[in-house]
Amino acid sequence: MTHLKITGMTCDSCAAHVKEALEKVPGVQSAIVSYAKGAAQLALDPGTAPDALTAAVAGLGYKAMLADAPPTDNRTGLFDKVRGWMGAADKGSGAERPLQVAVIGSGGAAMAAALKAVEQGAQVTLIERGTIGGTCVNVGCVPSKIMIRAAHIAHLRRESPFDGGMPPTPPTILRERLLAQQQARVEELRHAKYEGILDGNSAITVRHGEARFKDDRDLSVSLNEGGERVVMFDRCLVATGASPAMPPIPGLKESPYWTSTEALVSDTIPERLAVIGSSVVALELAQAFARLGSQVTILARNTLFFRDDPSIGEAVTAAFRAEGIKVLEHTQASQVAHVNGEDPQVATVGYSEAEAHHDGIETDSRTLTLDNVPRALANFDTRGFIKLVIEEGSGRLIGVQVVAPEAGELIQTAVLAIRNRMTVQELADQLFPYLTMVEGLKLAAQTFTKDVKQLSCCAG
């Protein structure tokens, strides 16, 4: 058996990709890759080059070295071989023409693949039957975050924490104007990040139409402007995304229901809104509409965030109910009459305790409520917590769960800590700027060895 040390993996999915890459290297019989151990165990044919193994891992953006050998950066020429094993074109192969790549779709995955293919020397034809940009910029991340931001400002005006010094004022919501501002920014970003990039890249040809496979080397594209065009390819990526699934509830199809797509472009705020589901998208929109004036009821088949640490769902449910949002847990809609980012935010990385135990990893953990974070106190907003999960024995940080108004900003520091295989003590020993929310990570790390309630503001 040959053993590799691998750094840079952040989750089990990373390990799965590394395993797939290693098993494509000639001479590798099998590979067992563990994210938790940062290691791989391989069965090899005699004469298999160790450098080929480390290059395969490097091709995914991670670092690998033989467990019993010093590190080496001498990988000249191996990356091209890795690309070949992964099914990509070898720019140095001396081919008479560039690799022809067809990409069906124009969202984030399609764009990333098209640009990477061009970077490696390919010619790309990108086919889109609808609006360039896919879900995120048009009907997903961008408009939803703009709407959530508007709803957050409405909430701040309505719920001032400063009592008589800055009395709250019920906001006037002009949804039509908010929608116009939202869509203007959507169009701006779509042009800047998608249309403009495609127009400026001579190696990418865009066809507006619907594609179907003619055979294993040709696509037939029914152009939106009329007519058909055949697109020949050496490689084809189908990156068409997904669409909402409608639950089989009697009467739903006959009702004026929304998916997230319709909700984000509605020019009215409904008086009452029932949200069926408890996914991030459902909860983000539920809270946004509640803050903009709707009476919102969430129907959750289980609890909120039931796949995560239970304390996350409990904290978000309490926050929603405090805002007047009805949360009905363990409830399923049986019939319809015929007539996110949620706040506080939720951010997680790595293992939850349950996931670690499922994978056979013994853990220890600490949870720091935000009333122990000075910046949260200064903000008059102590909703939420920071939870750190470590590997028992080694003390290595393997998971972080955060519920906080700025959870999305905090989590990147946790990502870096896990990616660099830091121990909780190493995290506790870092210098963090005082009176910032991210300081909460240091304080949470300190709770493994100290009572942070007994520390002065800048001590530790």
From Swiss-Prot:
Record's keyword annotation contains Metal-binding: yes
Domain HMA: residue ranges: 1-65
Role, per record: Resistance to Hg(2+) in bacteria appears to be governed by a specialized system which includes mercuric reductase. MerA protein is responsible for volatilizing mercury as Hg(0).
Miscellaneous section: The active site is a redox-active disulfide bond.
S-S bonds: C136-C141
One of the Pfam families matching this protein, by short name: Pyr_redox_2
Similarity comment: Belongs to the class-I pyridine nucleotide-disulfide oxidoreductase family.
Name by which UniProt lists this protein: Mercuric reductase
Residues annotated for Hg(2+) binding in this entry: C457, C458
Subunit structure: Homodimer.
Binding site for FAD: A110, G130, T135, K145, A211
Class of the enzyme per the UniProt entry, highest EC level: oxidoreductase
Cofactor binding mode and count: Binds 1 FAD per subunit.
InterPro entries: FAD/NAD-bd_sf (IPR036188), FAD/NAD-binding_dom (IPR023753), FAD/NAD-linked_Rdtase_dimer_sf (IPR016156), Heavy-metal-associated_CS (IPR017969), HMA_dom (IPR006121), HMA_dom_sf (IPR036163), Pyr_nuc-diS_OxRdtase (IPR001100), Pyr_nucl-diS_OxRdtase_dimer (IPR004099)
Stored PANTHER family: MERCURIC REDUCTASE
CDD domains listed in its UniProt record: HMA
Cofactor(s) named in the record: FAD
Keywords of this entry: Disulfide bond, FAD, Flavoprotein, Mercuric resistance, Mercury, Metal-binding, NADP, Oxidoreductase, Plasmid, Redox-active center
Positions of a metal cation binding: C11, C14
GO BP terms: response to mercury ion
Catalysed reactions, semicolon-separated: Hg + NADP(+) + H(+) = Hg(2+) + NADPH
Gene Ontology MF terms: flavin adenine dinucleotide binding; mercury (II) reductase (NADP+) activity; metal ion binding; NAD(P)H dehydrogenase (quinone) activity; oxidoreductase activity, acting on a sulfur group of donors, NAD(P) as acceptor
The protein's Enzyme Commission number: 1.16.1.1
